[in-house]
Amino acid sequence: MQKEIRKTISKIKETGLQLLFPGRCPVCDGIVRPFGRKICPECLPKLKPVTAPWCMRCGKKLAEEREYCGDCMHREHKYDRARTLYEYRDVAPSIYRFKYSGRQEYGDFFGEEMARLLGDFIGRVRPDVIVPVPLYRGKLRKRGYNQAACLARALGR
């Protein structure tokens, strides 16, 4: 019973916060409607998901079918595999605002998009945990949050 009451209070609080402080679109930075998608309907088509073929190491879009991009063939990475959600040039301003302008709500949008677009890939990999890359203390103090942790939380939901 108490658990249900806490859940209801939490939902009321969340609803109030969304009404008082609506989120911002990660593409145009305009205000988005509460309780809807976390992106403007006009902006959604501007984001082009990276589709095959892509580099098996870094996830970068490839012009032709092959295993690795030119960078990964000549460079060693500290990871085995990565995937790219969108073309970088389409989301670069958004990533900048997410990292340096306090737009933590972008993490919810991108985390949900990661789950939607990369869910099959993540399911095949079957991770035991999702661990965000830690930030240096100075950067964490300056920004006030770890953007990788925002993404990991949203993806974990």
Give residue spans per PLM region:
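Glycine-rich phosphate/pyrophosphate-handling loop used in enzymes and phosphotransfer proteins
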Residues: 1-157
